[in-house]
Amino acid sequence: MNVTSNATAAGSFPLAFGLKTSFGFMHYAKAPAINLRPKESLLPEMSDGVLALVAPVVAYWALSGIFHVIDTFHLAEKYRIHPSEEVAKRNKASRMHVFLEVILQHIIQTIVGLIFMHFEPIYMTGFEENAMWKLRADLPRIIPDAAIYYGYMYGMSALKIFAGFLFVDTWQYFLHRLMHMNKTLYKWFHSVHHELYVPYAYGALFNNPVEGFLLDTLGTGIAMTLTHLTHREQIILFTFATMKTVDDHCGYALPLDPFQWLFPNNAVYHDIHHQQFGIKTNFAQPFFTFWDNLFQTNFKGFEEYQKKQRRVTIDKYKEFLQERELEKKEKLKNFKAMNAAENEVKKEK
């Protein structure tokens, strides 16, 4: 019996893609031997730990680049949340300033990631068959071998990553909300991000460096530690969270965008938070909205509409913004007329 070859076969990555595998090791009379060895990297030139730091940065600029091309060549004007001229008119930070601040944020998060990685264990393999054999012995026979195999090899990772999603959402909601409730924190830190009233993709991580460290870098670092993510699981969590954050700030409500279909916390939802009328609402980010719903901090302007439909459409949101602008102009017109009338009365006296 070649235990080493069995361990290697059962733990090999391609099996997840439907290649034939045998679960016979789960029915050995004795538990398969443990043959610990360092887990090979996905890329021969780079460790998985380094890849977990590089992949989110590459994903950030790749996805931002796609949206920038769409923006520059006007490829999806129908789905643009705000007219293109508003980007220059309403935003207080230049694109170059935003670009440099995001580069700084990436440098900081990479350095912090390297520090975290220094204290992480060396991830090993060669114990998986032994662990699954024990599970097979303890679990009812009605549970198929394949369920144990794929549940152990991939299901547990999915649960850990989902737990990471929940922690990141919790961390960011309460810290983000605190930044708005405390005037000092808002003035010194969070106000930088709100210099972009009309968000765009590569401005997603445009923050004061201190806020960027606390909100994004430290939050995901703690999530990684508490959920005991391996380097490969970190790659998924960090990269997915990064792409979701970019998509939330992209400035478009694209109908086939998977992020905007999978999550209620989408580009329109977050755009409301960047507007003056919604700045004290919609704190939840980047995945779910349950904290906003629980604490009633979600924007109520779409409450009736959301009862009828699962998500806010781009047309409805544009209509809403136009109505607010007309109301604002009408109020200003009435205010000026009232002042003029008061001045006339004073002159007559």
Swiss-Prot record:
Domain Fatty acid hydroxylase residue range list: 162-297
Catalyses which reaction(s): sphinganine + 2 Fe(II)-[cytochrome b5] + O2 + 2 H(+) = (4R)-hydroxysphinganine + 2 Fe(III)-[cytochrome b5] + H2O; an N-acylsphinganine + 2 Fe(II)-[cytochrome b5] + O2 + 2 H(+) = an N-acyl-(4R)-4-hydroxysphinganine + 2 Fe(III)-[cytochrome b5] + H2O; an N-acyleicosasphinganine + 2 Fe(II)-[cytochrome b5] + O2 + 2 H(+) = N-acyl-4-hydroxyeicosasphinganine + 2 Fe(III)-[cytochrome b5] + H2O
Topology of the protein relative to the lipid bilayer: Multi-pass membrane protein
Organism: Saccharomyces cerevisiae (strain ATCC 204508 / S288c)
Residues passing through the membrane, by range: 9-29, 50-70, 99-119, 148-168, 209-229
Pathway(s): Membrane lipid metabolism; sphingolipid biosynthesis
Protein name (record): Sphingolipid C4-hydroxylase SUR2
Phylogenetic lineage: Eukaryota, Fungi, Dikarya, Ascomycota, Saccharomycotina
Enzyme type, top EC level: oxidoreductase
This protein's encoding gene: SUR2
Family membership noted in the UniProt record: Belongs to the sterol desaturase family.
Alphabetical keyword list: Endoplasmic reticulum, Lipid biosynthesis, Lipid metabolism, Membrane, Oxidoreductase, Transmembrane, Transmembrane helix
